[in-house]
Amino acid sequence: FGVPEGATVLLVFGGSLGAHHLNEAVCSLKDELLARPGLVIVHSTGADDEAFVRQTLSLTDEQAARWQVMPYISNMGEALAAADLVVSRAGASSIAEIAALAAPSILVPYPHATADHQTTNAHYLVDAGAALLVPDAELDGASFSSALTGLLDEPERRAAMREAARG
């Protein structure tokens, strides 16, 4: 991913189909995120949302070096291994990959999933202390922003979450 040594990597993805509301919420934090020296965002938008995210962000070349926008990540294992923090939906495959690589995460379950199974999935990591859960309805509010900035500001907390994920 061409991430500079020592950078803090925020990985954002919505699963194989992407997640428009999640993309909107992360894009709304552009100025706040890019104001953090050493932060690199790797943002997998889903194919349907790539143009929307690129247009919404309107990144300069300098900003684009720190905010990598792509429709899909073919080597998710490599991306998760590089990530200091993950923001993701909570589909079964996403949870399995996040857990396998012990990546600290903020999980935003898709609210219309059958029988709310993504919330159930998320609790696997949340209950272990390896993730935070932010309901989709709270993406536009202070809880998502404060959860994200709080974890970016606390490397010790992320390290504890990583250890919790390892069991």
Regions found by a protein language model. Name each.
Residues 1-2, 157:
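A short helix/loop element that forms part of the nucleotide-sugar donor recognition site in Leloir-type
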Residues 148:
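Hydrophobic "lid"/C-terminal helical patch
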Residues 3-88, 119-123, 127, 134-144:
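Donor-nucleotide binding loops and adjacent catalytic segments primarily
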Residues 157-167:
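A short, well-ordered alpha-helix in the C-terminal region of glycosyltransferases
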Residues 104, 130-131:
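Residue-level detector of anion-binding/catalytic polar loops
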Residues 76-118:
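A donor-sugar binding/catalytic signature common to diverse glycosyltransferases
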